[in-house]
From Swiss-Prot:
It comes from Escherichia coli (strain K12). The gene is rpsF. The keyword Acetylation applies. Disulfide bonds: none annotated. The keyword Plastid does not apply. GO terms for molecular function: mRNA 5'-UTR binding; small ribosomal subunit rRNA binding; structural constituent of ribosome. This is Small ribosomal subunit protein bS6. Keywords: Acetylation, Ribonucleoprotein, Ribosomal protein, RNA-binding, rRNA-binding. Signal peptide: none annotated. Residues 120-135 have a biased composition (Acidic residues). The modification N6-acetyllysine is found at residue 93. One of its GO terms (biological process) is cytoplasmic translation. PROSITE patterns: RIBOSOMAL_S6.
Length: 135
């Protein structure tokens, strides 16, 4: 079986359907003896340019190992599903399991935000103790 990277974008009004879509697609892959190496739901993001007068879309990334028949079936499903506004299936040489740059950047921002919040809380506590000493 070959390795594939699949990215599909869902209409922003259909975002609540994304978990069900992911479940159906993963069931099709695993049902055909395939493996899912990475699954990332990037959520609703701004598009680089408008597609069908839309400026946002819900992104999903999957790295899978599956037979060609399943990939053909997925591509057909993407093509005839009105909620999917764009999709791309690429064959890769190896399984990709590490987090994508999108998720890494989000994690780094979260860590920086948490560090800043902790520093701010520590500074506030230090300021409160100094005021108590002055009184």
């Amino acid at each position: 079986m070959r390795h594939y990277e699949i990215v599909f974008m869902v209409h922003p009004d259909q975002s609540e359907q994304v978990p069900g879509m992911i479940e159906r697609y993963t069931a099709a892959i695993t049902g055909a003896e395939g493996k899912i190496h990475r699954l990332e739901d990037w959520g609703r993001r701004q598009l680089a340019y408008p597609i069908n007068k839309l400026h946002k879309a819900h992104y999903v990334l999957m790295n899978v190992e599956a037979p060609q028949e399943v990939i053909d079936e997925l591509e057909t499903t993407f093509r005839f599903n009105d909620a999917v506004i764009r999709s791309m299936v690429m064959r890769t040489k190896h399984a990709v399991t590490e987090a994508s740059p999108m998720v890494k950047a989000k994690d780094e921002r979260r860590e920086r935000r948490d560090d800043f919040a902790n520093e701010t809380a520590d500074d506030a506590e230090a300021g409160d103790s100094e005021e108590e000493e002055e009184e």
